């Protein structure tokens, strides 16, 4: 989903009936606007799901767009956008630091559960698997990377990599974000 109100479906995906949810939050994570619609997305298509948004441009907002399958209620896509004018972009610099708890479980893959335990949105969170030498381990496949957590929101990320690629060092997971102090686990 895009901020323009358009949804797209790739040529490889079957046609889908989706629920589209658009929710706008202020920079403190308080919901200020919400809209929902249903749309049919044929394969290899772009469809207008709702009218493009034109928020108050004197303030900054976070816009969360979700596409949910009508068939099984599975979340198909989540996108978060920041909307601001040049004048209001200064508001981002004054956002409080968010606290994110991290729980790592080792299964065949690493499962990381991140929870925003603060009253502030945790913005632009990024995970980075590194060796104890500080160098990035590559290649690594993350189920999601570079995302936002609203207050109280929890997200589970799967991380796949080959131990050989750690160059004989122990892996460390670095979690950082715009307003999240770096965490190393």
What do the PLM-derived regions correspond to, one by one?
Residues 42-47, 105-107, 151-154:
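Solvent-exposed, conformationally flexible loop/turn segments
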Residues 96-147, 157-160:
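C-terminal accessory/binding modules appended to enzymatic or scaffolding proteins
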Residues 11-13, 54-56, 103, 118, ...:
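Sterically constrained small-residue positions within well-ordered secondary structures
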Residues 35-41, 50-54, 101, 143-149:
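Beta-strand-rich interaction surfaces with strong enrichment in secreted/lumenal proteins
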Residues 1-40, 48-49, 59-70, 114-115, ...:
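Beta-strand-rich binding/interaction modules
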Residues 2-4, 81-107:
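Low-complexity, acidic Ser/Thr/Pro/Gly-rich terminal tails and inter-domain linkers that flank the onset
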Residues 40, 46-94, 138, 156-185:
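Terminal connector regions
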Residues 1-5, 140-141, 149:
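Generic low-polarity alpha-helical segments
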